[in-house]
Amino acid sequence: MRSNNNNPLTRDEILSRYFPQYRPAVAASQGLSGGSCIIAHDTHRIVLRRHHDPDAPPAHFLRHYRALSQLPASLAPRALFYTPGWMAVEYLHGVVNSALPDADELAALLYHLHQQPRFGWRIALSPLLAQYWSCCDPARRTPFWLRRLKQLQKNGEPRPLRLAPLHMDVHGDNIVLTSAGLRLIDWEYAGDGDIALELAAVWVEDERQHRQLADAYAARARIDARQLWRQIRLWHPWVIMLKAGWFEYRWRQTGEQQFIRLADETWRQLRMKG
């Protein structure tokens, strides 16, 4: 269901107009961004998501809804409703762990996603990195950051190994173990891109876990494991800069200390690796 109302509504207006029998049940949960909530009527729950990024165009939020509308129930929650500034999606009952599933399970989930039809829009990291630079706190801009950004822009993004629909925010809190298996939530950054970029961006604990995931995926996708790992390593500098820039971006938007700590740690990792 999609509304044609062009003016963003408040949460209370959304509830009274479209979900009059529902009431807020949980203010925040795993996989929910700022301003989102769970609403409930008796035992039925729905996730109500708000477009929370003031610097992102409304089209990005609509893409999020369209991605969910295209994906099968074996991968993601169903998209239920859209109006400018808000969407409602199915609430997935299950268990969320901060740790990733084992390599074979996660590889199977990602391979299943990458077998789906493409979304229709490409993920472009270079303009996104430039946006993070321009939108961050000016006091946080450093010559090191600028040098790394210009070097990546000069080199250009790696040539894709295989193009597929990507989730691009795979970590334990965005994976729900339901009675029917693993599902991914929070598709805010989804788009089409290289499968190796997806694998490079997974929030792993260390290189050993990363190699296990890459090897499990290569076996399932029938790709040479060494070739896949080389491609993942080509994307690695882009992913680290993406994470550092995103932490800076969110620090500027929210002022939350967790983001500045994460940004500082990511910059330290980059400097150590030269």
From Swiss-Prot:
* EC numbers: 2.7.1.89
Q: Which cysteines are joined by disulfide bonds?
A: none
The record, for InterPro entries, names: Aminoglycoside_PTrfase, Kinase-like_dom_sf, Thiamine_kinase
Q: Which EC class heads this enzyme's classification?
A: transferase
- Kindly indicate where the leader peptide sits in this chain: none
Per the record, the pathway is: Cofactor biosynthesis; thiamine diphosphate biosynthesis; thiamine phosphate from thiamine: step 1/1
Q: Which UniProt keywords apply?
A: ATP-binding, Kinase, Nucleotide-binding, Transferase
Question: Which reaction is this enzyme known to catalyze?
Answer: thiamine + ATP = thiamine phosphate + ADP + H(+)
Which GO MF terms does the UniProt record name? Answer: ATP binding; thiamine kinase activity
Under the heading SUPFAM superfamilies, the entry gives:
Protein kinase-like (PK-like)
GO BP: any one term: thiamine metabolic process
Q: HAMAP family from the xrefs?
A: Thiamine_kinase (MF_01604)
Q: What does this protein do?
A: Catalyzes the ATP-dependent phosphorylation of thiamine to thiamine phosphate. Is involved in thiamine salvage.
Q: Which family does it belong to?
A: Belongs to the thiamine kinase family.
**Know the name of this protein?**
Thiamine kinase
This chain's source organism reads: Salmonella dublin (strain CT_02021853)
Lineage of the source organism?
Bacteria, Pseudomonadati, Pseudomonadota, Gammaproteobacteria, Enterobacterales
**Gene that encodes the chain:** thiK
